[in-house]
């Protein structure tokens, strides 16, 4: 029998500190009594974060009554993120935020966060592991996927082999990652004039791995890029569907709210 407390829905977490990882990637550390018992082995997993209402600036969290969710007057803004790391010994959770200005609910909150700042959180959730065991791995994503990619690389066995492609808009976002020696890290600069996403182009040009009896892949980031990469991996590399996890986080030109249903359609599509 577990002595862990019953999970609160959602958890209320307090700001502890923040750390700049790169020009547009900011790590925020959180804590709180609700966090006690959070699983330690879920780095990279999906979480839902609730930010203060954008009109009022007030953080009120939904409550569960039976099978129903009751939303407060000042409805919070939900966004999906990844667990970067949880340290049970000190009960601290790290979340990495992409910051492209203070007008975004998540990045804006992270930039302004200070002692006294709070958020709500539900999770973790999603597949475990994020990438399936295989002889070779292909990992690709943009800056929004770096927290999950970093967690995956840290969990892989030391003799793991494969390729990692990360697309960024600015050279200042390139930074060191902990990774197995034979996982080749490739940073790509996005060219807005390219007709084909950089990640898909890079994967298409990969040499076939020698002596590999199995391949697995993790792809995350912008919608069209994920779709293109997924198609190449399935059609050209013949990666089995259960060895490929492809998840779009966002779509260029669309807000989170406008993209929500389409995102789930992409994830649920048969490929």
UniProtKB/Swiss-Prot annotation:
Gene3D superfamilies per record: Nucleotide-binding domain of ferredoxin-NADP reductase (FNR) module (3.40.50.80), Translation factors (2.40.30.10)
EC number of the protein: 1.16.1.7
Thermal dependence, as annotated: Optimum temperature is 37 degrees Celsius with Fe(3+)-nitrilotriacetic acid (NTA) as electron acceptor.
One Pfam assignment: SIP
pH dependence as annotated: Optimum pH is 7.0 with Fe(3+)-nitrilotriacetic acid (NTA) as electron acceptor.
Reaction catalyzed: 2 a Fe(II)-siderophore + NAD(+) + H(+) = 2 a Fe(III)-siderophore + NADH
Cofactor entry: FAD
Subunit structure: Monomer.
Family: Belongs to the SIP oxidoreductase family.
Record's protein name: Ferric vulnibactin reductase VuuB
Phylogenetic classification of the source organism: Bacteria, Pseudomonadati, Pseudomonadota, Gammaproteobacteria, Vibrionales
Name of encoding gene: vuuB
